[in-house]
Amino acid sequence: GLTAGMVSAQATTKSLATNFTLVNLSPNDTEATVNYYLPDGSAWKDPDVIPVPGNGGQAIVRQYTDPDLSDGLGSAAVTSLEPLAGLVQQVIDPAAGQVPTSGAYAAISEGSTVWYIPQVAKNASSATGIANSWIIIQNLGMDVVSVNVSLTKYGASTPELVTPIADIPMGASYYYDLNLEAGLSTGFFSAVVEVDGTGTVGVVSDLFFGANSMMSFNAFPVEAVTDAWSIPLVYSRLTNSLVTSIVVQNLSGSEIAIGDISLECTPDPASPSQATISTANTAAIPANGIVAWNTLTQTAIFPATWFGPCKIDSASDAGIVSLVLYR
């Protein structure tokens, strides 16, 4: 899994900290060993050994209350004799006294050689404030690993920038702050993180909007690419202000034609609006490019006070991934 310590960086001025929850998926009690790493691969502190009861037992580990962890960026690797699941929460350090900000992602149990992120940003304008991203890359192998990060601006067919990141130590994470990338223009991008040579990595991303909003999510490994995705719940301009963005990235290796990617939505029985939503991409999608839908701004497609499940499908069976963001 990936985890950050207390930190403030250019993409955000917040003092972020983490906690993670481990869940034992076995009927047997077990112990989890947690190794903490600094970005240079050295030990951040001595390993923790944490008991986790069987049958869904949990252990919650808070980095911001650990006196042995210095302020800064880092990563963690968790091992156990029994299968565990993990959830990482990023929050404001309670001692910082700042406006609350939070996000969460699933711990990564298996590395891959290629990861996809449908949406990242550098000083991009949005309806909810200026957007900036971190891309966090953890070495999940036993030797140093190098990667290339390709960033393709929305609407473009080729990467604007390919950034080589060399020699990430075992267990360590590299924090790529797009706000600090001088070679990148402002705007929204899709990203591809690919291992250069041998090894495997895990990837997550933080997307910051304005002063106080943050969304954390897992990148998609190449093994997850498919031609259809189901979304259990989409919100459209609810009375409590909830809205949804859907971003679909073309990973087929070639252009996807107009009308190939469909979005079909059925209202929940309790939805105030009972409209059925049916739409498709109105422009061709270049390789690694995206089509996006936004229930806040696309009022002609998405009625107000609507919620329900949706399905995304490629008529040509093109390989895609889909990112859903709630705001």
Language-model regions: role of each:
Residues 1-327:
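Gly/Pro-rich, tryptophan- and cysteine-flecked surface segments typical
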